[in-house]
Amino acid sequence: MRKQILIINRVPCFFILLFFLFSLTYLNSQPPKHSEKEKIGYLLETLENSNLIFIRNGDEYSSKEARAHMQKKLEYAGNRITNVDQFITYLATKSSISGKPYYVKYPDGKKVESSIWMRELLNNLEEKK
């Protein structure tokens, strides 16, 4: 009788231990998420290296100039920008003075709003992880 009780008590413990081990394996197999700061850095670096034309208030700028401008805006915003969505929405999509949207222009002349372009980059980054 005593052996039956011990066996019955061991069975749930075995399954709990097994579940715990599988959970740890699953959690360790997930790639680490990028921090919000890393995501913003990725967008800025990709912009700088894109060699696209950046259009701000109707004027064209190089991708390096665009990155410098957005970096300045980010530094000025300080801790008010806490995630990549805020960065795109408040800093990388339109002029804070005129309210006009920013655009990126491809070598073939196609223009796309910077918000769309950046959100596509962000989606690509999220899919890679």
Regions of interest found by a model, annotated:
Residues 27-29:
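Boundary at the C-terminal end of the N-terminal hydrophobic targeting segment
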Residues 12-23:
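Bacterial N-terminal signal peptides
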Residues 2-14:
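Bacterial N-terminal signal peptides that target proteins for export
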Residues 31-50:
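Short N-terminal segments immediately surrounding and downstream of signal-peptide cleavage
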Residues 6, 23-25:
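Intrinsic disorder/low-complexity signature
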Residues 32, 53, 58-129:
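Compact alpha-helical subdomains of small soluble proteins
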